[in-house]
Amino acid sequence: MEGSTVRSDLIKKGPDRAPHRALLKATGVTDADMGKPFIGIANSYIDIVPGHVHLKEFGDLVKEAVREAGGVPFIFNTIGVDDGIAMGHIGMRYSLPSRELIADAVETVIEAHQLDALICIPNCDKITPGMLMAAMRVNIPTIFISGGPMAAGRLKDGRRADLITIFEGVGAHSRGMISDEELKELEDLACPSCGSCSGMFTANSMNCLCEALGLALPGNGTALARSAEREALARAAARRIVEMALAGGPRPRDIVTPEAIDNAFALDIAMGGSTNTVLHTLAVATEAGIAYPLERINALSARVPYLCKVSPATAEVHIEDVHAAGGVMAILKELSRKEGTLHPHCLTVTGKTIGELWAEAENRNREVIRPVEDPYAETGGLAILFGNLAPDGAALKVGAVDPSITTFTGRAICFDSQDEALQGIFGGRVQPGHVVVIRYEGPKGGPGMPEMLAPTSAIVGMGLGKEVALITDGRFSGGTRGICLGHISPEAAEGGPIALVRDGDVITIDIPGRRLTLEVPADELERRRAAWVKPAPKVRKGWLGRYAALVTSANTGAVLRTPEE
């Protein structure tokens, strides 16, 4: 211990730390271990989440590898929520708030025990961003190694399927378009194994973005769960984190800069990633002390082409195909051939720059990862729309909108909750030409900003995906497709313009112009605003009550702030 200068010396060095060492020895730590770096392993194993059900064994592998590399591993667990299982009922209100609990939990364990470095093992939707937020707070050497995606399902006729296929199947079944037996086949075959759901949904989007941010090793976002390659990545991450702990860096805030966030959004735009990545990456930026305006995303989208179309944008390509084609680094390498799209100098946990990493990659399938000369679209798969209906922005997954649709004008049909909207959709009230407005489902109003996968999937499954639009102050699943705008800010519960919309109002969605417009005169909107009454909070007690009182707007990542802030 004499030459040790690591952070954990605070809990293990000197005569006055004899009680601390005694407690550590009770866990199996030896005198020889006291001179080694203490490595926290934030796992997220939980039985009810298929993306996490295998993480106990995976975490043990990482723990063993850290010890082999010369570190002292301490594994701990966070909670996790499966958004698919929580979808469409009260449970979804707990999904986004779980991100804050995860961030707080990781911060608490790391700071309480003054650990030297951190390996994060996330996988699904809110776990990855929650751990990213914690990493920004504690700012000790950190590597992310996710649990990996599941393979796509295979139906009896050879077609591929995934979770979104089932959600859309529910809509088709409600219209008599598929039988009970066909729906049961989807249920049985679409999700064949453990791992994060197999499309470019929120979980895989965030795990891919970890690579682009520089916080994960190449392959993290795409190598399948339980594959030999995933295990090799875990061992490599363990070796590297011990090196970083001894060197004292690089640290997360050295890596996550505005330029690194640009790179992450550029990847997201090139892949048509989930709109949730906007919410989560803004939250990570906020925790890192970075002001990142939404307009910067639109500037990127204007010059970043859409190169890699993955489910739900196409039924034919899943994350496993992206991995076989070369993965995230191959996409970045292809994108780097267009000047002004990426920042190659950004640092990564490997010690190399991101440009050095993508230089080693190869695009092995130009049908899966298009060359920049032949993109799916010259501009990207993600956009932020502004206008009198969304003064602080609304997020749109352009890559999941039919390419034939560039503008949509329709009449509003308003619902003050997701449940009301589902009743209206399945009850036949929603017709071609409608813009479905689902409000009071934002961070405060929900509370918890629930995802709207059930209504969007029902609309698509019923064959209305090109004829009906949906806008909301809530969120969407990464699997949502169609003309769907979420994260409308300010939200209805805060008196945002979405609260003033009435049935029959004309709404125009202009995708190329990045405008969302309520075609109602300003003086009429002022009259409506004067008559508007702020509703009482839906929840006043417990975690959701505290969350609703402290959460900020979607345009700043829906992070929590104490009242004095």
From Swiss-Prot:
It comes from the Bacteria. One of its GO terms (biological process) is L-valine biosynthetic process. GO terms for molecular function: 2 iron, 2 sulfur cluster binding; dihydroxy-acid dehydratase activity; magnesium ion binding. It catalyses: (2R)-2,3-dihydroxy-3-methylbutanoate = 3-methyl-2-oxobutanoate + H2O; (2R,3R)-2,3-dihydroxy-3-methylpentanoate = (S)-3-methyl-2-oxopentanoate + H2O. The active site is at S477 (proton acceptor). Its cofactor is [2Fe-2S] cluster; Mg(2+). Mg(2+) binds at D83, D125, K126, E451. Disulfide bonds: none annotated. It is an enzyme of class 4 (lyase). InterPro entries: Dihydro-acid_dehy_C, DihydroxyA_deHydtase, DiOHA_6PGluconate_deHydtase_CS, ILV_EDD_C, ILV_EDD_N, IlvD/EDD_N. Pfam families: ILV_EDD_C, ILVD_EDD_N. Pathway: Amino-acid biosynthesis; L-isoleucine biosynthesis; L-isoleucine from 2-oxobutanoate: step 3/4; Amino-acid biosynthesis; L-valine biosynthesis; L-valine from pyruvate: step 3/4. Its EC number is 4.2.1.9. Keywords: 2Fe-2S, Amino-acid biosynthesis, Branched-chain amino acid biosynthesis, Iron, Iron-sulfur, Lyase, Magnesium, Metal-binding. [2Fe-2S] cluster binds at C124, C197. The keyword Lipid biosynthesis does not apply. Homodimer. This is Dihydroxy-acid dehydratase. It comes from Symbiobacterium thermophilum (strain DSM 24528 / JCM 14929 / IAM 14863 / T). The gene is ilvD.
